[in-house]
């Protein structure tokens, strides 16, 4: 699973 920056 890739690391995505959603800024939650």
Curated annotation (Swiss-Prot):
Where in the sequence is Leucine amide found?
8
Cellular component annotations (GO), alphabetically ordered: extracellular region
Biological process, per Gene Ontology: neuropeptide signaling pathway
Indicate where this protein resides in the cell: Secreted
Alphabetical UniProt keywords: Amidation, Neuropeptide, Secreted
Q: How is it modified after translation?
A: Position 8 could be leucine amide or isoleucine amide.
Keyword Secreted attributed = yes
Principal location listed in the UniProt entry: secreted
List all disulphide bridges recorded for this chain. none
Functional description taken from the UniProt entry? May act as a neurotransmitter or neuromodulator.
Q: Which family does it belong to?
A: Belongs to the allatostatin family.
Protein name in the entry: Allatostatin-2
Gene source species = Rhodnius prolixus (Triatomid bug)
């Amino acid at each position: 699973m890739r690391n995505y920056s959603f800024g939650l």
